[in-house]
Curated annotation (Swiss-Prot):
Cofactor note: Binds 1 zinc ion per subunit.
GO MF annotation list: immunoglobulin receptor binding; integrin binding; metal ion binding; metalloendopeptidase activity; metallopeptidase activity; SH3 domain binding
Pfam families, per the entry: ADAM_CR, Disintegrin, Pep_M12B_propep, Reprolysin
Keyword set, alphabetical order: Angiogenesis, Cell adhesion, Cell junction, Cell projection, Cilium, Cleavage on pair of basic residues, Collagen degradation, Cytoplasmic vesicle, Disulfide bond, EGF-like domain, Flagellum, Glycoprotein, Hydrolase, Membrane, Metal-binding, Metalloprotease, Phosphoprotein, Protease, SH3-binding, Signal, Transmembrane, Transmembrane helix, Zinc, Zymogen
Ranges of biased composition (kind: Basic and acidic residues): 35-44, 779-789
Keyword Cytoplasm assigned: no
Post-translational events: The precursor is cleaved by a furin endopeptidase. Phosphorylation increases association with PTKs.
Signal peptide range in chain numbering: 1-17
Classification via PANTHER family: ADAM A DISINTEGRIN AND METALLOPROTEASE DOMAIN, DISINTEGRIN AND METALLOPROTEINASE DOMAIN-CONTAINING PROTEIN 15
Role summary: Active metalloproteinase with gelatinolytic and collagenolytic activity. Plays a role in the wound healing process. Mediates both heterotypic intraepithelial cell/T-cell interactions and homotypic T-cell aggregation. Inhibits beta-1 integrin-mediated cell adhesion and migration of airway smooth muscle cells. Suppresses cell motility on or towards fibronectin possibly by driving alpha-v/beta-1 integrin (ITAGV-ITGB1) cell surface expression via ERK1/2 inactivation. Cleaves E-cadherin in response to growth factor deprivation. Plays a role in glomerular cell migration.
Protein name (database record): Disintegrin and metalloproteinase domain-containing protein 15
Length: 863
């Protein structure tokens, strides 16, 4: 077997062998299709650098596929080095491959171990560059140096071993094409909001916009597509190359694409493939729901057909349908041998499923791209250049859809492709590694050592998930993903991982919006909310009779949608509310599209005239559907809209599922009980005895407060007790109140004042007795006599003069006698003996707490 076949996923380990018989070629060969896309190309022999030594790429592929790969490539005469790493998230775990034998028997090859042959990376020396290349069958992919310099790499027709054919994207002349949305559009997108990204007044603990999402993708190749390739191996190679570009396109939006399965209708088509894309989409979605989804769980399925659709349409999908079991899919025409053209078309349809609308014309949705015709992936039509990037409008639309509750199935982390050998720096945590943040130049994780792929000292986790903060695991129960609407449920950290658990929502049929709707696929929208999303704040549902009259007519102003042939379908009176949206008031112009026609009509209701107005919205030439009511909208007591028909809500099984929760919980999207606080899963029958952390915190706070109050009361009681004891003991009390500063030394005691002041002093303070003799009084007695207030005249005779003591027993030295006689006793003193007021400038008298010193030798101070 040729070398290319050995490596073009030769690549397969365990599992059933892939079909290798030649397939009849009824759709035209790759060589024939390439004739219509001729453009200036240049062959080139790439080289692989190992230890800075150039080795032939062909020689490297004969041995093994290294995980880090450096390729030396010449572009426009200049040598460039591509620094690449294997994309290990492209094929998670073991994908499912399906094909059919000649007798119609389906062959399912599960558990294949694919050797990873797809790489992503950058060009050395070019900031903002990116590379997406597969080596499954030669060297194929895309190299973007700058927005103005982008190249595609393709293998020549029939030559899988030769050098790749390199073309500038500007030299690719693809046929003009457009996209048509199906009439079953399930959400109403808006024009870009005026506020820039990141300025919404919504606080999130972990922004769902920045959290990585993963789309589990299944690609189905119809019979005409399968006939273009010699065997299943070649078809698988091309599918991997397309899926790699899809992942590259969506990666800047924090959305990863993982190929979980490939099915090829190798013998015949399993549904009718019509030139009308609406018919093909309708048939494919019915087959997906009934046959594909039960045996191969996934988020989105994309049909690739070799049949040409009528007109310029190359694809069709349903707006905002991701995660829906009924509508999450699209159909795509393989209109080019270039993988870039096909991948860009599939990315466009997958973008519609994610809630992305067509970009507005003009410069309102800027997008970097090759000059002069800078095109974005979500443009309604591209005449020449395929889009390589999503515009700012697409980013805002995805943000709005996520915050509205879309995409609950996208938050599940999938197992990556098993590694051939652990390699530190590939950004995948492998056996023996605690973390992997890439090479030294790329690593921005402060918790991870990029040289050893081990956590730094003291770190518990790598900061690659919302449950890790400052290199420490968040506690179990910390909310890592808040609710995003009435039908969403919060997620909490497990306590032993940095990753947030998969997103779950309320189960289908659980009531929301105050009973005006029920949850469907994790979303809730009442009729009023849908009107406001189309006509702005203040819009309300039209009068019931106006609504019923319009939708039962089945025309452009009102219907229950279109059938695959394009004609309008009238609603029955019972189903009228589940048909086209009929609103009143609000804006004069809708937020989506424009008014093509306006119809006014007066209806007689039991003799009363009712004025009704209906509009025919122009949503663009490539969008051929009215805006219909969302599934889950209430249409009567116990009735909701399902498949645009008013049906009983119990068909959704919510009540049956809720009965398993025994009245203490509700059902989630996995049909499990989400128990109320205080009740334990799985059936909410066991009441938790442990108090919550909040209750525990409150009890501890009250206990601390009680201890502080008791300590304060004890201190106050002790102080009062001491004061009472001092009052009882009098001058001998050993306790005194705190003083702000040293007390002034009092003058000599006056007998009259001493008798009168003792009572006053006892009420003021009680200084402690001195522990040693006091020093001599530094203030002269003459000055004391001048400053002291005169006492009242004595009321009884003075005592006899004291006996003069010897000098040894005398106290302080006798002060000099006054120079002049003291004044006579003043008249008119206050008989009460009160001290002068503060205006006299005389300090108040302080009575000493120690015994008075011996009196002077004179018998009176007034002599």
């Amino acid at each position: 077997m040729r070398l290319a076949l050995l490596w073009a996923l030769g690549l397969l380990g365990a599992g059933s062998p892939l079909p290798s018989w030649p397939l009849p070629n009824i759709g035209g060969t790759e060589e024939q299709q390439a004739e219509s896309e001729k453009a200036p190309r240049e062959p080139l022999e790439p080289q692989v650098l190992q230890d800075d030594l150039p080795i032939s790429l062909k020689k490297v592929l004969q041995t093994s596929l290294p995980e880090p790969l450096r390729i030396k490539l010449e572009l426009d005469g200049d040598s460039h080095i591509l620094e690449l790493l294997q994309n290990r998230e492209l094929v998670p775990g073991r994908p499912t491959l399906v094909w059919y034998q000649p007798d119609g028997t389906r062959v399912v090859s599960e558990g294949h171990t694919l050797e990873n042959c797809c790489y992503q990376g950058r060009v050395r020396g070019y900031a903002g560059s990116w590379v997406s290349i597969c080596t499954c069958s030669g060297l194929r992919g895309l190299v973007v140096l700058t927005p103005e310099r982008s190249y595609t790499l393709e293998q020549g027709p029939g030559d899988l071993q030769g050098p790749p054919i390199i073309s500038r994207i500007q030299d690719l002349h693809l046929p003009g094409h457009t996209c048509a949305l199906s009439w079953r559009e399930s959400v109403h997108t808006q024009k870009p909001p005026e506020h820039p990204l990141g300025q919404r007044h919504i606080r999130r603990r972990r922004d769902v916009v920045t959290e990585t999402k993963t789309v589990e993708l299944v690609i189905v190749a119809d019979h005409s597509e399968a006939q273009k390739y010699r065997d299943f191996q070649h078809l698988l190679n091309r599918t991997l190359e397309v899926a790699l570009l899809l992942d590259t396109f969506f990666r800047p939006l924090n959305v990863r694409v993982a190929l979980v399965g490939l099915e090829a209708w190798t013998q015949r088509d399993l549904v009718e493939i019509s030139p009308n894309p609406a018919v093909t989409l309708e048939n494919f979605l019915h087959w997906r729901r009934a046959h594909l989804l039960p045996r191969l769980p996934h988020d989105s399925a994309q049909l690739v057909t070799g049949t040409s659709f009528s007109g310029p349409t190359v694809g069709m999908a349903i707006q905002n349908s991701i995660c829906s079991p009924d509508f999450s899919g699209g159909v795509n025409m393989d209109h080019s041998t270039s993988i870039l053209g096909v991948a860009s078309s599939i990315a466009h349809e997958l973008g519609h499923s994610l809630g992305l609308d067509h970009d507005l014309p003009g410069n309102s949705c800027p997008c970097p791209g090759p000059a002069p015709a800078k095109t974005c992936i979500m443009e309604a039509s591209t005449d020449f250049l395929p889009g390589l990037n999503f515009s700012n409008c697409s980013r805002r639309a995805l943000e709005k859809a996520l915050l509205d509750g879309m995409g609950s199935c996208l938050f599940e982390r999938l197992p990556s492709l098993p590694p051939m050998a652990a390699f530190c720096g590939n950004m995948f945590v492998e056996p023996g590694e605690q973390c992997d943040c890439g090479f030294l130049d790329d690593c921005v994780d402060p918790c991870c050592d990029s040289l050893t792929c081990q956590l730094r000292p003291g770190a518990q986790c790598a900061s690659d998930g919302p449950c890790c903060q400052n290199c420490q695991l968040r506690p179990s129960g910390w909310q890592c993903r808040p609710t995003r609407g009435d039908c969403d449920l919060p997620e909490f950290c497990p306590g032993d991982s940095s990753q947030c658990p998969p997103d779950v929502s309320l189960g289908d049929g659980e009531p929301c919006a105050g009973g005006q709707a029920v949850c469907m696929h994790g979303r809730c929208a009442s009729y009023a909310q849908q009107c406001q999303s189309l006509w702005g704040p203040g819009a309300q549902p039209a009068a019931p009779l106006c609504l019923q009259t319009a939708n039962t007519r089945g025309n452009a102003f009102g219907s229950c949608g279109r059938n695959p042939s394009g004609s309008y379908v009238s609603c029955t009176p019972r189903d009228a509310i589940c048909g086209q949206l009929q609103c009143q008031t609000g804006r004069t112009q809708p937020l989506l599209g424009s008014i093509r026609d306006l119809l006014w009509e007066t209806i007689d209701v039991n003799g009363t005239e009712l004025n009704c107005s209906w509009v025919h919205l122009d949503l663009g030439s490539d969008v051929a559907q009215p805006l219909l009511t969302l599934p889950g909208t209430a249409c009567g007591p116990g009735l909701v809209c399902i498949d645009h028909r008013c049906q009983r809500v119990d068909l959704l099984g919510a009540q049956e599922c809720r009965s398993k929760c025994h009245g203490h919980g509700v059902c989630d999207s996995n049909r499990h009980c989400y128990c109320e606080e205080g009740w334990a899963p799985p059936d909410c029958t066991t009441q938790l005895k442990a108090t919550s952390s909040l209750t525990t915190g409150l009890l501890l706070s009250l206990l601390v407060l009680l201890v502080l109050v008791m300590l304060g009361a004890s201190y106050w009681y002790r102080a009062r007790l001491h004061q009472r004891l001092c009052q009882l003991k009098g001058p001998t009390c050993q306790y005194r109140a705190a003083q702000s500063g040293p007390s002034e030394r009092p003058g000599p005691p006056q007998r009259a004042l001493l008798a009168r002041g003792t009572k006053q002093a006892s009420a003021l303070s009680f200084p402690a007795p001195p522990s040693r003799p006091l020093p001599p009084d530094p203030v002269s007695k003459r000055l004391q006599a001048e400053l002291a207030d005169r006492p009242n005249p004595p009321t009884r005779p003075l005592p006899a003069d004291p006996v003069v003591r010897s000098p040894k027993s005398q106290g302080p030295a006798k002060p000099p006698p006054p120079r002049k006689p003291l004044p006579a006793d003043p008249q008119g003193r206050c008989p009460s003996g009160d001290l002068p007021g503060p205006g006299a400038g005389i300090p108040p008298l302080v009575v000493p707490s120690r015994p008075a010193p011996p009196p002077p030798t004179v018998s009176s101070l007034y002599l």
